[in-house]
Design a protein with these regions (language model features):
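Compositionally biased, charged N-terminal/linker segments
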Residues: 1-41
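Short, surface-exposed beta-edge/turn micro-motifs
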Residues: 1-2, 43-46, 94
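Generic structural signal for buried aliphatic residues
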Residues: 23, 45-47, 63
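Short coil-to-beta transition motif at edge beta-strands of beta-rich domains
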Residues: 34-58
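Hydrophobic beta-strand residues in large extracellular and virion-surface proteins
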Residues: 47-49, 66-68, 97-101
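Amphipathic alpha-helical interaction segments
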Residues: 54-55, 71, 75-79
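Short beta-strand-centered aromatic/proline hotspots
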Residues: 59-74
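Contiguous surface segments at macromolecular interaction interfaces
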Residues: 77-132
């Protein structure tokens, strides 16, 4: 199955999602926001999540496959003041996604579309578990 990849996700978040309850996660990494920008929420919409950094993502890496329930992308405006004077104004894009655990998965192939394009992966859902 080919789906968008979210990388650099905290191992604690992945562990929490494995319990099975839907969770809302806020993303601030540009590459992750770009990767989910074209994803439409729904029961057939999946995302691969892993704690591995984008640059290190390779075939054989493990993570989880989640179902996308909702996506919200927003722009936040921030103003910093220093000693009562205007100091700096900037905007920051963030995305909130609500996801639910689907299955453990292993990367079969990675597709990178440049720095400003989404990262997608071909994954195999784990159907057999080994103790060890």
């Amino acid at each position: 199955m080919r789906c968008a990849a979210l990388t650099g996700i905290s191992p604690e978040i992945i562990k929490d999602l494995r319990v099975g309850k839907p969770r809302t996660i806020e993303l601030q990494s540009t590459h992750n926001i770009v990767s989910i920008a074209s994803v439409k929420p729904g029961p057939d919409s999946h995302i691969f999540m892993t704690s591995i950094d984008l640059e290190d993502l390779d075939p054989g890496d493990q993570g989880i496959c989640v179902i996308v329930l909702a996506i919200s992308v927003s722009m936040k405006r921030m103003v910093e003041f220093s000693q009562g004077r205007y100091y700096e104004e900037r905007e920051r894009m963030s995305a909130r996604i609500q996801v639910k655990y689907c299955a453990s998965a292993v990367v079969k192939q990675v597709f990178r579309e440049g720095f400003f394009g989404p990262t997608t992966v071909e994954v195999l859902k784990s159907s057999c578990y080994h103790a060890g």
